């Protein structure tokens, strides 16, 4: 399976919104997502439109699509971006039948290279829910170094939870 990783288009942001709004309560819990924090779809789409109206270096996020033969496999988002310094990434395989097959490792490796290039990073972090085994294994296999486990709210959709902090440092 040939995997392509590239910056997401504005039209593809609808796939992120659909992914979260269609997810089961169990899946959201595994991700550490509080369903009451999900913006309504039209509001969320407007937020993405506003983001895409700005140059990359002025955005509060950077979105990446994962594809195979033009089929959407999943996505990564970066936030807490400090251009030239650091960012935090998130990772999602959207089709449940494609999970636990090792696809995420290649997607993450290619995404890391894209983030370091476009955002001119020295450090990239990822903080998945400590009890969600899949992304933690994926990050380890993709070359991230485990830093620590701690309690935090990793993003605007999340509740307070235990997360594992992973890092790639090229500073």
Give the residues covered by each predicted segment:
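Acyl-donor (CoA/ACP) binding surface of acyl/acetyltransferases
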Residues: 1-15, 21-26, 65-171
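A short helix-loop-beta-strand connector motif used in the catalytic cores of GNAT acetyltransferases and
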Residues: 50-64, 74
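Intrinsic-disorder/low-complexity coil detector
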Residues: 6, 34, 38-41, 54, ...
């Amino acid at each position: 399976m040939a995997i392509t990783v590239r910056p997401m288009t504005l039209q593809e942001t609808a796939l992120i919104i659909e992914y979260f709004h269609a997810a089961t309560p169990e899946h959201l819990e595994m991700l550490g997502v509080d369903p009451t924090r999900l913006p309504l779809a039209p509001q969320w789409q407007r937020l993405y439109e506003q983001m895409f109206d700005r140059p990359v270096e002025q955005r509060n996020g950077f979105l990446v699509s994962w594809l195979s033969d033009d089929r959407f496999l999943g996505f990564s988002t970066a936030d807490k971006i400090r251009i030239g310094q650091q960012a935090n990434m998130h990772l999602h395989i959207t089709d449940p039948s494609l999970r636990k097959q090792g696809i995420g490792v290649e997607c993450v490796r290619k995404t890391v290279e894209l983030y370091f290039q476009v955002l001119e990073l020295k450090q990239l972090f990822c903080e998945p829910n400590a009890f969600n085994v899949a992304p933690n294994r994926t990050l380890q296999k993709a070359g991230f170094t485990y830093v620590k486990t701690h309690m935090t709210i990793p993003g605007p959709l999340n509740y307070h939870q235990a997360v594992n902090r992973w890092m790639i440092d090229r500073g």
